[in-house]
UniProtKB/Swiss-Prot annotation:
Protein name, UniProt field: Photosystem II reaction center protein X 2
Principal location class: membrane
Pfam family, one: PsbX
Quaternary context: PSII is composed of 1 copy each of membrane proteins PsbA, PsbB, PsbC, PsbD, PsbE, PsbF, PsbH, PsbI, PsbJ, PsbK, PsbL, PsbM, PsbT, PsbX, PsbY, PsbZ, Psb30/Ycf12, peripheral proteins PsbO, CyanoQ (PsbQ), PsbU, PsbV and a large number of cofactors. It forms dimeric complexes.
UniProt keyword annotations, A-Z: Membrane, Photosynthesis, Photosystem II, Thylakoid, Transmembrane, Transmembrane helix
Subcellular location: Cellular thylakoid membrane
GO biological process, one term: photosynthesis
Residue ranges crossing the lipid bilayer per the database entry: 8-28
Amino acid sequence: MTPSLANFLWSLVYGAVVLGLLFGAIVFVSQRDRVRRR
């Protein structure tokens, strides 16, 4: 595997992790707000 390909794969992995954390935080906050608003 070439270093550039490895860097590309790692960037994809880190991007997926960041998106997952953001999505999880948004879902968590929306769930908590829905409970509090009721």
